[in-house]
Amino acid sequence: MALTPIGFGAWAIGGGNWEFAWGAQDDDESISAIHRALDVGINWIDTAAIYGLGHSEEIVGKALKAASHKPFIFTKCSMRWHQDRSIYRSLKAGSLAEELEGSLRRLGVETIDLYQVHWPNPEEEIEEGWAQLERFREQGKVRWLGVSNFSVEQMKRAQAIAPITSLQPPYSMLRRAIEAEILPFTQAHGIGVIYYSPMVSGLLTGKMTRDRIATLPADDWRRRAAEFNEPRLSRNLKLVELLREIGDGHGVTPGVVAVAWTLHHPAVTAAIVGGRSAQQVEQMAGALDFRLTDEEYGRIVGFLGDHPA
């Protein structure tokens, strides 16, 4: 499976009115964003059943019906919802079977390219859940198996049952914890790393200001996020100005620089980059090719060292 350096992240296009929403979203704009991502050369889409409580998968499915060519489709399981829209987690075999059928139906596909355990919860069900995913693979319903948000020890438990194709962790210049143990482990075991939030959920795009953050919709989870609030926000906005300075020298946005910084690490495979409109996708298309020099990478590392969280 040869992936482009960035993939289209479909979290935000799930829309509003659920616990981890990004606010209201126009479905036609979402479909246009997906089509534009494919047009600029992005060859994979990452979504999850829980995004918009199924709505993100439905929108991806609609976009695929009218797409000029078909990308790799990745989705995730283990987070479910009740009729009152409250979320619960399960890795029970029967629950996962129901989830898979729902995802296949919403996406309008017969096979999912990469099926991932979204979170290792409940932890005592990891083995049961991973064994069930391996059965899905044997049945031809999924092609590859991945995990998301797993620790090294949790990956070892899964590996004892069936191989792991990929890990999906958070990774950005503000969230570097995986560099210590997780990336050395995945590199040693041939596990791909497709990571989320390289731009810290939009914070490093260059579009976020204090005023914009203050007026985020009430159902936008970022209003509660530590990086979007003091005491971290001031440091983060200064970091964006450094990214802007570097990007201006190459004609790219701060967001493209932020993604390029993460892609500089030799143990990562590709970055998940969200887009809520065709225009946003076009602004990020430069991340397919742009790379930082070692000197530019070091300038950012130096700033982070001088301005700890």
Protein language model features and the residues they cover:
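Acidic (Asp/Glu)-rich catalytic clusters
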Residues: A2, G61-F72, L104-G108, R137, ...
